[in-house]
Amino acid sequence: MKLKTNIRHLHGSIRVPGDKSISHRSIIFGSLAEGETKVYDILRGEDVLSTMQVFRDLGVEIEDKDGVITIQGVGMAGLKAPQNALNMGNSGTSIRLISGVLAGADFEVEMFGDDSLSKRPMDRVTLPLKKMGVSISGQTERDLPPLRLKGTKNLRPIHYELPIASAQVKSALMFAALQAKGESVIIEKECTRNHTEDMLKQFGGHLSVDGKKITVQGPQKLTGQKVVVPGDISSAAFWLVAGLINPNSHLVLQNVGINETRTGIIDVIRAMGGKLEVTEIDPVAKSSTLTVESSDLKGTEIGGALIPRLIDELPIIALLATQAQGVTVIKDAEELKVKETDRIQVVADALNSMGADITPTADGMIIKGKSALHGARVNTFGDHRIGMMTAIAALLVADGEVELDRAEAINTSYPSFFDDLESLIHG
């Protein structure tokens, strides 16, 4: 796919699609609750559609009509054995969280995904689930998909310290703990996105959170709710960066989720001197309007507890750093290696091929700016965030063309991405 290049300004206002993390969880909680759940403004990206289809395969009635998802919950013990293996597509969130959901189901399932998902390690979730009494295994010692799982009605509670900062593993164990008899304690390495905790309470569940320690008493019952999904800050991040690095630009992003566990990119933009305004804050929906404009940027250091709050935004932050004066260091981000691709290497290769100066490290990157970008051919390797990062980078290219291979990967999380880009180019 040939990308738009040499765009000298971006103007306009858009509503980014619904938050992917919350969309996944709304389907899961709605399915496990008793009664009806209605979900508004859900993301209809391929990953979320995979989760929706999996729960249909598990016997849940889910209707998508007039822009509203209606789920007839079956309760914690109401899932049915599927007739076929469960297809998770490209979604690491789906396979990991649903492994926890099925921990208490007394039937056997196989879960598989596409080529990219089949390379992602699942041992981080299979190991603690085995401690709870679940029979679960994959391929090689890292438990790569496909996974075979047989849950148990006699699920044991767990006391577990996460060796990595992972909201997916934490959430999988929380879903399992809801079905175990007794108290489970999950201790995070660093605080990660807390959508599962927030939504558990919204659906009538109980837990206690004390810093990095989460305590869940099981078993519990959940009750169907109305869920309004805010815009995804991970999708908004591409427009935030586009507005900052393109000359003569001014962008307004409406209804963006600003959950405090996800707003690391706002902290980074401010540390780099970016002009960013947060207004119209809705404390209930945890959403706001974000306004950015072209800015002179300086390098910064990104690491530690900040990393889990912006792990998915690091590819586009790397592009931002190429347009900042000085050096930006990203560290403590080894988790990038086991995303849809090895994002440390793939981001560096993609942007370096366009003229950036990025040195990959064991746990991040060293980025020297400011770099003039030129045309190149870039492969997403099936990674949606690499595709969108490259499309934003291409806007700066004055010399040559930018070809993007496997651009369809963007549909994973942002099917309307190129439509929104066109609206901002012509705004």
UniProtKB/Swiss-Prot annotation:
Its EC number is 2.5.1.19. InterPro entries: Enolpyruvate_Tfrase_dom, Enolpyruvate_Tfrase_sf, EPSP_synthase, EPSP_synthase_CS, RNA3'P_cycl/enolpyr_Trfase_a/b. One of its GO terms (molecular function) is 3-phosphoshikimate 1-carboxyvinyltransferase activity. The active site is at 312 (proton acceptor). 3-phosphoshikimate binds at residues 20-21, 25, 166, 168, 312, 339. It is found in: Cytoplasm. Keywords: Amino-acid biosynthesis, Aromatic amino acid biosynthesis, Cytoplasm, Transferase. CDD domains: EPT-like. It catalyses: 3-phosphoshikimate + phosphoenolpyruvate = 5-O-(1-carboxyvinyl)-3-phosphoshikimate + phosphate. One of its GO terms (cellular component) is cytoplasm. The keyword Transcription regulation does not apply. Pathway: Metabolic intermediate biosynthesis; chorismate biosynthesis; chorismate from D-erythrose 4-phosphate and phosphoenolpyruvate: step 6/7. GO terms for biological process: amino acid biosynthetic process; aromatic amino acid family biosynthetic process; chorismate biosynthetic process. Pfam families: EPSP_synthase. It is an enzyme of class 2 (transferase). Phosphoenolpyruvate binds at residues 20, 92, 120, 168, 343, 385. Belongs to the EPSP synthase family. PANTHER family: AROM/DEHYDROQUINATE SYNTHASE (PTHR21090), PENTAFUNCTIONAL AROM POLYPEPTIDE (PTHR21090:SF5). Monomer. NCBIfam families: aroA (TIGR01356). Catalyzes the transfer of the enolpyruvyl moiety of phosphoenolpyruvate (PEP) to the 5-hydroxyl of shikimate-3-phosphate (S3P) to produce enolpyruvyl shikimate-3-phosphate and inorganic phosphate. This is 3-phosphoshikimate 1-carboxyvinyltransferase. It comes from Streptococcus pneumoniae serotype 2 (strain D39 / NCTC 7466). The lineage of its organism: Bacteria, Bacillati, Bacillota, Bacilli, Lactobacillales. The gene is aroA.
